[in-house]
């Protein structure tokens, strides 16, 4: 199969088709067979759109095509270099499209790595810097990775951790203590919270109204997670009068007319978004019939 074609549209379509086929018919050897082609494409292609699609295809090939943990981490290092250089490392200087793709692919790969402690410091520095990007998509993708890194710094409470203590949030309501903090994510946490708070309330008229809304919605969630890492995307702080507790995560995916799937953690959102980039409107069909997709998001379906 010839992957490198001269026509821009055909090339992007081929890479989407490759990713779709990998998810539909997974193979433990496909990553080894196409890694070099995909890396060469996103490094050398003159089309920014092709670079971005090749980056996403590589992340799908790595996760579903048999890459080892060390290979996943090597790709993540390469993607982080793209982010740190604002795209310059692959001849895509200041391309929001390419840097966004690198951030998104990095986050998707990170969901497959159990222990992120050693990679967290360099990653946080890169993603915090991108919060100042002039491209809203870059800002959001970087912010979602920051939230994921805070989430991954906590793991399930084990016997050695002792019993959970009763902890309360700023309004005196109980905090989930079933997860325990294992390491610090970022030294300048107060400064980070200030930056996230500014983005969550961005009011500059220089930014389009729809982009301001995107910033407000996403960075309110990200700030909430940085403050309380057990809280996932679209966590509703409002209190349910019947239970006396916060409503919690309100992000759901409707599965036909019969049920909903709750996306209450950042790793779930990263995987959902990665699958949707490839599967588009066919996600629900694949979720019901494709074991690979279901195993990526093994979430119980609730009756709606």
PLM feature segments, named:
Residues 182-189, 193, 197-304:
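Long C-terminal extensions of eukaryotic subunits of large macromolecular complexes
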Residues 2-46:
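Helix-rich alpha-solenoid scaffolding regions
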Residues 22-32, 62-73, 110-120, 151-161, ...:
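Flexible loop/turn segments at the boundaries of HEAT repeats in alpha-solenoid HEAT proteins
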Residues 66-70, 74, 84-92:
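Extended non-catalytic scaffolding segments
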Residues 14-25, 41, 54-66, 82-83, ...:
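Hydrophobic residues within the alpha-helices of tandem HEAT/HEAT-like
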Residues 136-171, 175-195:
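Alpha-helical scaffold segments of alpha-solenoid architecture
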Residues 3-10, 40-50, 85-97, 129-140:
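Short coil/turn segments at helix-helix junctions and helix-capping linkers
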Residues 1-2, 27-38, 68-80, 116-124, ...:
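Core helices of alpha-solenoid repeat scaffolds
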């Amino acid at each position: 199969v010839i992957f490198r074609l001269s026509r821009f549209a055909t090339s992007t379509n081929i890479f989407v088709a490759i990713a779709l086929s990998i998810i539909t018919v997974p193979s433990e050897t496909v990553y080894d067979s196409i890694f070099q082609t995909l890396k060469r494409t996103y490094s050398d292609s003159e089309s920014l759109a092709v670079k971005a699609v090749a980056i996403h295809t590589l992340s799908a090939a790595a996760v579903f095509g048999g890459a080892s943990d060390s290979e996943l981490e090597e790709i993540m290092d390469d993607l982080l270099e793209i982010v740190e250089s604002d795209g310059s490392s692959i001849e895509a200087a200041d391309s929001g499209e390419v840097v966004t793709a690198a951030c998104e692919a990095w986050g998707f790969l990170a969901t497959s790595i159990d222990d992120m402690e050693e990679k967290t410091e360099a990653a946080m520095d890169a993603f915090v810097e991108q919060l100042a990007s002039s491209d809203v998509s870059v800002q959001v993708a970087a912010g979602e990775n920051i939230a994921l890194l805070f989430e991954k710094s906590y793991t399930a409470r084990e016997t050695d951790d002792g019993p959970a203590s009763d902890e309360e949030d700023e309004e005196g309501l109980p905090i989930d203590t079933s997860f325990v903090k294992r390491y610090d994510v970022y030294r300048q946490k107060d400064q980070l919270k200030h930056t996230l708070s500014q983005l969550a309330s961005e009011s500059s008229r220089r930014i389009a109204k729809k982009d301001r809304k995107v910033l407000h919605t996403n960075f309110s969630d990200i700030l909430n997670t940085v403050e309380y890492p057990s809280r996932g995307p679209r966590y509703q702080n409002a209190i349910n009068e019947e239970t006396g507790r916060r409503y919690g995560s309100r992000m759901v995916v409707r599965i036909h007319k019969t049920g909903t799937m709750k996306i209450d953690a950042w790793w779930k959102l990263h995987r959902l978004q990665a699958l949707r980039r490839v599967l588009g409107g066919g996600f629900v069909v694949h979720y019901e019939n494709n074991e690979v997709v279901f195993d990526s998001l093994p979430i119980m379906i609730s009756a709606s």
